Curated annotation (Swiss-Prot):
The keyword Acetylation does not apply. It is a multi-pass membrane protein. It is found in: Membrane. Belongs to the major facilitator superfamily. Sugar transporter (TC 2.A.1.1) family. Keywords: Membrane, Sugar transport, Symport, Transmembrane, Transmembrane helix, Transport. GO terms for cellular component: membrane. It holds the Pfam family Sugar_tr. It comes from Arabidopsis thaliana. The keyword Transmembrane applies. Residues 1-19, 477-506 are cytoplasmic. The chain crosses the membrane at residues 20-40, 81-101, 117-137, 141-161, 168-188, 201-221, 287-307, 325-345, 352-372, 390-410, 430-450, 456-476. GO terms for molecular function: monosaccharide transmembrane transporter activity; symporter activity. This is Sugar transport protein 5.
Length: 506
C-alpha cells in the first residue's frame, strides 16, 4: 500500500499511447488562449489603480491620501472602494462558474468558452468608455462572467483533448496564457501611464485578447467526451479521429470505447441532483482536493501580489514608471517559470513541483517580511533605501518563479483531471467558484491586511504556504500519465483516500 508521500503505481490504468497531432496542438492552443483574458485583467487592474487620472476621476480620496507626505507606507492605498473595483469581477466570476457547469454539460465546452469571450469583450468596451463608478463596476461584472465561463470550460477542454502522457504540459498552456496576459497588460500599463486617458486605453484593450480567443474557438470542435455525454456519438468519433490522426485508428477505437463507457455514467447523472451526486462518499477525495487546492492557491498570496504589485513597489520607494517596470519583470519571470514547467511536469510529476515550489515561496515570504521589518519597521514610517527596494523585487521574482512551476499551473490542472466524467463539469465549476471566492476575499482584504499586519502580512501567507505543502505531502496522490477516465485508481490506492472510494470505475 502506498504511503502519503509515495507515488502510486497506476501505470496499468490505460495503455493508450495517443500521439501529438497538429489538430491536438491547435485545439489546445486555442483553448489555452482563454487564459489571456484572465491574465490581462489581473495585470491591468493593479497598474490602472495607480494611474493619477484614473484615481482623480473615480477615487479622489485615495489620491489625496497617497499625496500626503507622512502616510504610513503600508496603508497608502487602503481603500475598500478601490479594492471593490478589482474584486467585483470575482463575485461575478463565482456566480458564472457555477452556472457554467450546466452550460458545459448541456451545450459543450466550446460553446461555453465562446460565450465567455463575447461577454468579456462587451465588459471591456464598457470599462474603456466608463463615465462613472456605476459603468466601471458594471463592466467589471461582465468581465467576471466572461472569465467565470472560460475558466470553468478551458481547463476541462484541455484535460479531455490532450494525450494522457502529455496532459500536464498541454494543460499548463492555460496558465502560460494567463501569465502572457499579465505581461502584456504590464507593458500596456507602462506605455499608457503618462497619458491622460491611458487608463481608458488599458481597460478597453482587454477586448483584444477576448476577440482573439473567441474567434479561435469558432474553428475548433468540442471534446469527444462532451459530445458523447450529449449523445452525439458520430460527431465524437469524428472529433477523436481528427485529434488522434487517422493512422492511429486502432487506438482511436480503444479510446472511444472507454469514453463511451464513461459517457453513459454522465448521461445517467443528468437525472440526479448536483449536490446529491458530488457529495456522495465515493467522491469525497475529489471534492476535498478540488476545494482545498484553489483556496491554497490564493493563500500563497500570488494573486494579490499581481493585483497590487505596482502599489506595493510604489509603497517601498519606486516611482510610477519604475514600479510598473518592476511589475513587468515580475510577470516575465513567472511566465518563464511556467514555460519551464511544461517541460518537466510530465517527467517529475505534480507532487514534486508542488513541494519544491512551496519551499521556495515560503523562504521568499519570510525574507521579504524580515527585510520590511528592518527597514520601514512596524510603524511603516521608515524609509526603504533603493538597494533594499531592489532586493524586495528580486525576492518577489524568485517567489513568482516558484509559483510559476507549482501552485500557478497545477491549481488549474489537478482539479480538471481528477473528476470522473459523471461529475466533471460540476466538479470543475465548484473548483473555479472556490477560486473566485478566495480571490475575492483576499483581494478585498489584502490592502487592509497589509495596513494592519504590516510586514506580518507576508508571514501570514508564509504560514499558509507551509500548511499547504504539508497537505500535498500527505494527501495529494500523483496523477501524471493517468488517463482522466482511469483516475479512480489513484484514489483507491492512496493510504488515506482509499477508505472513501469503492473499487469500481464509477
Amino acid at each position: 500500500m502506498a504511503g502519503g508521500g509515495l507515488a502510486l503505481d497506476v501505470s496499468s490504468a490505460g495503455n493508450i499511447d495517443a500521439k501529438i497531432t497538429a489538430a491536438v496542438v491547435m485545439s489546445c492552443i486555442v483553448a489555452a488562449s482563454c487564459g489571456l483574458i484572465f491574465g490581462y485583467d489581473i495585470g491591468i487592474s493593479g497598474g490602472v489603480t495607480t494611474m493619477k487620472p484614473f484615481l482623480e476621476k473615480f477615487f479622489p480620496s485615495v489620491l489625496k491620501k497617497a499625496s500626503e507626505a507622512k502616510t504610513n507606507v503600508y496603508c497608502v492605498y487602503d481603500s475598500q472602494l478601490l479594492t471593490a473595483f478589482t474584486s467585483s469581477l470575482y463575485v461575478a466570476g463565482l456566480v458564472a462558474s457555477l452556472v457554467a457547469s450546466r452550460l458545459t454539460a448541456a451545450y459543450g465546452r466550446r460553446t461555453t468558452m465562446i460565450l465567455g469571450g463575447f461577454t468579456f469583450l462587451f465588459g471591456a468596451l464598457i470599462n474603456g468608455l466608463a463615465a462613472n463608478i456605476a459603468m466601471l463596476i458594471s463592466g467589471r461584472i461582465l468581465l467576471g462572467f466572461g472569465v467565470g465561463f472560460t475558466n470553468q470550460a478551458a481547463p476541462v477542454y484541455l484535460s479531455e483533448v490532450a494525450p494522457p502522457r502529455w496532459r500536464g504540459a498541454f494543460n499548463i498552456g492555460f496558465s502560460c496564457f494567463i501569465s502572457m496576459g499579465v505581461v502584456a497588460a504590464n507593458l500596456i500599463n507602462y506605455g499608457t501611464d503618462s497619458h491622460r486617458n491611458g487608463w481608458r486605453i488599458s481597460l478597453g484593450l482587454a477586448a483584444v485578447p477576448a476577440a482573439i480567443m473567441t474567434v479561435g474557438c469558432l474553428f475548433i470542435s468540442d471534446t469527444p467526451s462532451s459530445l458523447l455525454a450529449r449523445g452525439k456519438h458520430d460527431e465524437a468519433h469524428t472529433s477523436l479521429l481528427k485529434l488522434r490522426g487517422v493512422e492511429n485508428i486502432a487506438d482511436v477505437e480503444t479510446e472511444l470505447a472507454e469514453l463511451v463507457r464513461s459517457s453513459q455514467l454522465a448521461i445517467e447523472a443528468r437525472a440526479e441532483l448536483f449536490m446529491k451526486t458530488i457529495l456522495q462518499r465515493r467522491y469525497r477525495p475529489h471534492l476535498v482536493v478540488a476545494v482545498v487546492i484553489p483556496c491554497f492557491q490564493q493563500l500563497t498570496g500570488i494573486t494579490v501580489n499581481a493585483f497590487y504589485a505596482p502599489v506595493l513597489f510604489r509603497s517601498v520607494g519606486f516611482g510610477s514608471g519604475p514600479a510598473l517596470i518592476a511589475t513587468f519583470i515580475l510577470g516575465f519571470v513567472n511566465l518563464g517559470s511556467l514555460l519551464l514547467s511544461t517541460m518537466v511536469i510530465d517527467r517529475f510529476g505534480r507532487r514534486f513541483l508542488f513541494i519544491a515550489g512551496g519551499i521556495l515561496m515560503l523562504l521568499c515570504q519570510i525574507a521579504v517580511a524580515v527585510l520590511l521589518a528592518v527597514t520601514v519597521g512596524a510603524t511603516g514610517d521608515g524609509e526603504m533605501k533603493k538597494g533594499y527596494a531592489v532586493t524586495v523585487v528580486v525576492l518577489l521574482c524568485i517567489y513568482a518563479a516558484g509559483f510559476g512551476w507549482s501552485w500557478g499551473p497545477l491549481s488549474w490542472l489537478v482539479p480538471s483531471e481528477i473528476f470522473p466524467l459523471k461529475i466533471r463539469p460540476a466538479g470543475q465549476s465548484l473548483s473555479v467558484a472556490v477560486n473566485f471566492a478566495a480571490t475575492f476575499a483576499l483581494s478585498q482584504t489584502f490592502l487592509a491586511t497589509l495596513c494592519d499586519f504590516k510586514y506580518g502580512a507576508f508571514l501570514f501567507y508564509g504560514g499558509w504556504i507551509f500548511t499547504m505543502t504539508i497537505f500535498v505531502i500527505m494527501f495529494l496522490p500523483e496523477t501524471k500519465g493517468i488517463p482522466v477516465d482511469s483516475m479512480y485508481q489513484v484514489w483507491e490506492k492512496h493510504w488515506y483516500w482509499q477508505r472513501f472510494t469503492k473499487p469500481t470505475s464509477t
